[in-house]
Swiss-Prot record:
Its cofactor is [4Fe-4S] cluster. This is NAD(P)H-quinone oxidoreductase subunit K, chloroplastic. It is found in: Plastid, Chloroplast thylakoid membrane. Its main location: plastid. [4Fe-4S] cluster binds at C43, C44, C108, C139.
Length: 238
C-alpha cells in the first residue's frame, strides 16, 4: 500500500498544496512506521527472521523491531503459547501504548496447532488472551505471506483513520433561528443603507436616541449654554 494513497490526502487538492491537520499527519506517520515487538517461541519465528535480510528487506515498510513494549505499536506472536507464558504475554500487551495491533502468525499461535491435542499446558489460540487484528495461518507461513499480512494491517489502519475523520468532520455552519436578525434603518439615512441589528441591542439603540420632551420646541431650536459666546466676545472687545 502506497502511503500517498492514504486518507491524509484529498483527491480535490492540487499537487503542490496539501491541506491537513496535525492529527491526520500523525496518523499518516503512524501508518508508515509500524514498530513491532517480536514474540517468537518456536519455528514460525525463523521464517520471520528471513525478512530482515536483503531479499525481502522489511525496513522499506517502516518496520523497526523494538525490544521494549513501551516503544512498540505492533505485537507479532509466533509459535506455541503455554499457560506459564500467558501472564507475560498479557503484561507485554498491556504495556504497549495505544493504538496497538496484534498479528497472530502460524497455526500454533492461532489454534494451538498439534500441541493443543490433549495438552494441559497449551493455550488454544492467542485470541483467548489478547485481541488479534490479523490472523496469518501456516506451518510455518512464508515470508511473502508475512509481508501480505503487514500490508493488510496497514490497509485496516488507513480505513480506521478515514472513518475517524469522517466521524468528526465538521459540517457547514449556519446562523440559527435564535439569532433573530431583522432589517433596520441605518444612521446614514441619506444613503438609504440597510443593516442587520440584533434584537437584544434594539432596545439599547432606541433608548440612546430617545430624548425626554422638556419643551415642545424642535431639537435644533433648543438653547444651549455658550450658544452666543461669539457675540459676547465681540462686545467685550476680544
Amino acid at each position: 500500500m502506497n502511503p500517498i494513497e492514504s486518507s491524509l490526502l484529498d483527491q480535490t487538492t492540487s499537487n503542490s498544496v496539501i491541506s491537513t491537520t496535525l492529527n491526520d499527519l500523525s496518523n499518516w506517520a503512524r501508518l508508515s512506521s509500524l514498530w513491532p515487538l517480536l514474540y517468537g517461541t518456536s519455528c514460525c519465528f525463523i521464517e520471520f527472521a528471513s525478512l530482515i535480510g536483503s531479499r525481502f528487506d522489511f525496513d522499506r515498510y517502516g518496520l523497526v523491531p523494538r525490544s521494549s513494549p513501551r516503544q512498540a505499536d505492533l505485537l507479532i506472536t509466533a509459535g506455541t503459547v503455554t499457560m506459564k507464558m500467558a501472564p507475560s504475554l498479557v503484561r507485554l500487551y498491556e504495556q504497549m501504548p495505544e493504538p496497538k495491533y496484534v498479528i497472530a502468525m502460524g497455526a500454533c499461535t492461532i489454534t494451538g496447532g498439534m500441541f493443543s491435542t490433549d495438552s494441559y499446558s497449551t493455550v488454544r489460540g492467542v485470541d483467548k488472551l489478547i485481541p488479534v487484528d490479523i490472523y496469518l495461518p501456516g506451518c510455518p507461513p512464508k515470508p511473502e505471506a508475512i509481508i501480505d499480512a503487514i500490508i493488510k494491517l496497514r490497509e485496516k489502519i488507513a480505513q480506521e483513520i478515514s472513518e475517524d475523520r469522517n466521524e468528526f468532520q465538521q459540517g457547514k455552519r449556519y446562523f440559527t433561528r435564535k439569532h433573530r436578525f431583522h432589517f433596520g434603518s441605518s444612521i446614514l439615512i441619506e444613503n438609504k443603507e440597510e443593516r442587520f441589528f440584533h434584537q437584544s441591542y434594539e432596545s439599547r439603540f432606541e433608548s440612546t436616541l430617545e430624548i425626554t420632551p422638556k419643551t415642545s420646541e424642535p431639537i435644533s431650536e433648543i438653547s444651549y449654554p455658550f450658544k452666543n459666546l461669539k457675540k459676547i466676545r465681540e462686545v467685550a472687545g476680544e
